[in-house]
Amino acid sequence: MAGDKGGYRQINSSLNICAFEDYLKSQTDNLPELPDVEQITPRVLRVLGQNPGKFTYQGTNTYIVGTGKHRLIVDTSGGEIEWAELLESTLSSLNISLSHVLLTHWHGDHTGGVPDLLRIYPHLEHDIYKNEPESGQQDIVDGQIFRVEGATVRALHVPGHSDDHMCFILEEEQAMFTGDNILGHGTSAVEDLGTFMASMQRMLDQRCLTGYSAHGAVIADLPGKIRTELANKRRREKQILLALGRVRQRRQKSITVEDLVTEIYGESMDESTRTLALTPFTDEVLRKLAGDFKVAFEVRAGKRRWYSVE
């Protein structure tokens, strides 16, 4: 995958993604090893994408779903020939054929393997499904059902990480293929925090028990993981609102995002953490709070200065 970005460079333009390694290292230091191929349940076979990295962790998880000869696959890794060869040999050894290809979203570490799939399995030409499809692909709509022997899969449109992001619910297991919305380890980058949090609640409302993420290990307690994600986001919102309240108490009308980071975290952090992680993350939360009409900004000397409206 070029630059090991996996599509993330488009998510937050203020984030210097190439210099983000210190933050990512904290999420990837203690990752468990995952086998290249693992039968997770009688209905779910995981094939690792052979693309490990800072953003993909152990690699993109691709899932073969069903119990019969004809099964569907969720995601296709990033175009690594090693994945295509591993998938082909695995399916051949099990006498399995593919009938549908379901893509969670547009990022390259999920869609890059499609050309290899079509080269190996040309019968799939009209069976590549994605929300907001590209040329030659079929659309996925919210609530759409895909059936193969032993598996009923329901599509769920849950944007936030990306506008087109779909999760897929395996009805027989009360399990969800969570894509990049919920990861097996750490937390996901998002395009729109408000939309993402609404999607988290919608995912929680499905009452699924287990999560099969696109990156990392199986999520044994999916509701707990989603609640933790929501709680962490809400805690950051509260932290920012409290800091803006202190600014107002000092009779200071407004504050830049850079000064707000100092207000919250102090002066002692290293500059790379401040500018490459905390500042863009704080800006992301401020934009969400502005959408909730809890904060606003004025522009002075060409810079946004934020204040609480509560």
Curated annotation (Swiss-Prot):
Signal peptide coordinates: none
Pathway it works in: Pigment biosynthesis
Recorded catalytic activity of this chain's protein: atrochrysone carboxyl-[ACP] + H2O = atrochrysone carboxylate + holo-[ACP] + H(+)
One MF term in the entry's GO annotations: hydrolase activity
SUPFAM superfamilies assigned to the protein according to its UniProt record, in alphabetical order: Metallo-hydrolase/oxidoreductase (SSF56281)
Positions annotated to bind Zn(2+) 1: 105, 107
Biological process according to GO: secondary metabolite biosynthetic process
Active site: 109 (proton donor/acceptor)
Requisite cofactors: Zn(2+)
EC id: 3.1.2.-
Induction per the UniProt record: Expression starts 10 days after infection and shows an increase towards the late stages of infection which correlates with the formation of the sclerotia and thus the pigment production. Is directly regulated by the cluster-specific activator CPUR_05433.
Keyword Metal-binding carried by entry: yes
Keyword Plastid: no
Cofactor: binding details: Binds 2 Zn(2+) ions per subunit.
Binding site for Zn(2+) 2: 109-110
SMART domains cross-referenced by the UniProt entry: Lactamase_B (SM00849)
Keywords assigned by UniProt, alphabetized: Hydrolase, Metal-binding, Zinc
Pfam family, one: Lactamase_B
Similarity comment text for this entry: Belongs to the metallo-beta-lactamase superfamily.
Function: Atrochrysone carboxyl ACP thioesterase; part of the ergochrome gene cluster responsible for the typical purple-black color of the ergot sclerotia. The ergochrome gene cluster produces several ergot pigments including the yellow ergochrome secalonic acid and its derivatives, as well as the red anthraquinones endocrocin and clavorubin. The pathway begins with the synthesis of atrochrysone thioester by the polyketide synthase (PKS) CPUR_05437. The atrochrysone carboxyl ACP thioesterase CPUR_05436 then breaks the thioester bond and releases the atrochrysone carboxylic acid from CPUR_05437.
Name of protein: Atrochrysone carboxyl ACP thioesterase CPUR_05436
Protein species of origin: Claviceps purpurea (strain 20.1)
Lineage summary: Eukaryota, Fungi, Dikarya, Ascomycota, Pezizomycotina
